[in-house]
Amino acid sequence: NKKRTGRVVSEYGMQAMPNYSTIKKVTNPEDRHLFSDVLKVHQKAGNGFMKLNSYLNRYFIDSTKVEKMNVKDYTYLTQCMQYYSLKNIIGIHRSKAPYNMGTLVWQLNDCWPVASWSVTDYYNRQPKAAWYAMREAYRDDIVPAIDLTRPIDLPLENPNISWKIKGNEITLKATKAAKYVYIEIEGYTGKLTDNYMDLEAGKEMKISFEGKLNKPVITVMSLYDVLNRYK
């Protein structure tokens, strides 16, 4: 709530699916559909998927379209949802200083591969989308921005994202503004300098990764790409 907040707010968060690479490790291909028995085993929150779907309906996509989604796109959207939530909650809390002088997110990491409030994945502690949101929102040198428009209400256009790789650096460029741009590198277990970021139209953004990769298989997608599949 933008008008009401506590002096110190602790143990709050938003669920999201684990990274899709993790889902592939703990499922067989026939289990990768919403909401398979195996996926339900990896969701321990009471009415967890129902709650996630209600949040997606409010902020990202009509609930009638959620049922048509594949698991990979659903995973992406829930992570965008977690990013959006923590970015704005932390931003609102910090904007209330000095009345609010403390905000503690639940949770950092997982003890098993599962849909949860964690902002890092069980395997290799790889960041989920919200990890990047938290890193930015907790910076001391900025006043964190607060989104005034819900993603579901954004006038998204096809960003036609292009990318090129040189050494351990990926350069991205979009013809139209792009939201929640996600870079996936197949088999990569390290960290990127940024992910799930926004791109301004016509401006290049450089993202680095750890180590060296031999002929990496890279996929880049944005919120427009996912939502456009379910029009």
How would you describe each model-predicted region?
Residues 101-107, 182, 219-221:
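Conserved active-site loop/cleft motifs that coordinate metal ions or position small ligands
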Residues 1-145:
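Substrate-binding clefts and catalytic carboxylate motifs of secreted carbohydrate-active enzymes
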Residues 161-163, 190:
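Beta-rich interaction modules in large eukaryotic scaffold/regulatory proteins
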Residues 174-191:
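Short acidic, flexible loop segments centered on an aromatic residue
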Residues 136, 140-157, 212-231:
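Terminal connector regions
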Residues 166-176:
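Short beta-strand elements of extracellular/lumenal beta-sandwich folds
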Residues 103, 172, 183, 202:
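Hydrophobic, well-ordered secondary-structure elements that form the walls
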Residues 136, 140, 145, 188-214:
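Intrinsically disordered, low-complexity Pro/Gly/Ser/Thr-rich segments with frequent PxxP/GP/PP motifs
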